[in-house]
Amino acid sequence: MSKRDSTSKESGVSSLIAAIKHFLTSREETIPGIKDVLANISSSVVANNLCESGQAVSPNQQKMLQAAISNIEHKSLLPIRDSLKLAEDELVWRQDDSTYYSADADLGEGYKASNLHTLLIAPANAKYYHPDFTLGFFLLGPFTLYRDHFHLAPELYVNLSPVSGWRLDGGEWRDYGAGSLIWNGPNEVHATRSYDHPFFSIFSWVRNTRSLCKLAEKPDWEKLEKDLHDKKLASIGGRDRLPDTMPDAMPDAMPDATIEKNE
C-alpha cells in the first residue's frame, strides 16, 4: 500500500490489511490469483474522499459479528483476528442494498436478513482506494443459504469460520474449515451455506468490480433453506439435538484445505 498523503498516520485498517497480506503471501503458490490480489493490495492508496456513512448495525447483527470474530481460532488466522479487533471502531458495516445485485434479485429471506460486509480497499466506501479491486469481510447469519450465483469478477475467499459448506459449479456440497481458500474464476457458479456458526470470510474481487452478481437458479433452494431452518429450530431446542441434523461431510472440513479453480 502507498499513501497519497505522507502525513497520514498508521491506522488499525492498515495493520489489518498487512495481516491479511502476510497470510496470503504464505500461500501465494497455492492459487495463481493470489498474486493478483497481493499486487492490488500493494498498489492501493489512502482514500482522500472517504464517506463513512452506513446503515446502523442492529443489536442482533452486532452480536452475530462479535460471535463470528470470537470463532476465529485457527492458529494461522490469529494475527488477522487480533488486528480485526483493534480495527473494529474504524470499520463501517453495510447490508447489500442492491449494490451487488439488481433490485429484483431473489436472494432469499435468510440472506436479506443477515448479510453484512465491510470494505478495506475498494473504488469507494473504503479507507484505501483502488480503481478496480476490492478487499473486505463478508458475514452471514447461522443456518443461511447464499444461493448459487456468479459474476464476472474473479474472486478469492479466505474462510474464517470453523466450517462452511460450498457448492462449486453445481457440484456436490463440500465443507471447508478455517483457513481454507476458495477461488472462483469469472462467471463460475458458486453457493455457500452456514451451519450453527455465522459464515465469516475475507473476500476479494480482483477486477471487474463494477459488474453485478447474477443468480444461477437451482431446483433445490427451497429444500436447502427448509433443512437449514429446521436445524435452526433444533439448535434453539438444545445443542444436544444439533449433531443429529448436521451434514455427514464434516471430515472434509479440514484446516488449510484449498480448492483451485481455473479461469
Predicted regions and their residues:
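Exposed loop/turn and edge beta-strand positions of beta-sandwich/beta-sheet ligand-binding modules
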Residues: 114, 134, 153
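Double-stranded beta-helix
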Residues: 195-263
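Short acidic-glycine-tyrosine-enriched beta hairpin
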Residues: 130-132, 156, 170-189
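Short, conserved beta-strand element in jelly-roll/cupin
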Residues: 137-143, 149-166
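Short beta-strand His + acidic residue motifs that chelate non-heme Fe in jelly-roll/DSBH
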Residues: 146-149, 165-168, 184, 189-195
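A short beta-strand motif that forms part of the nucleic acid-binding face
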Residues: 152-153, 160-163, 170-172, 196, ...
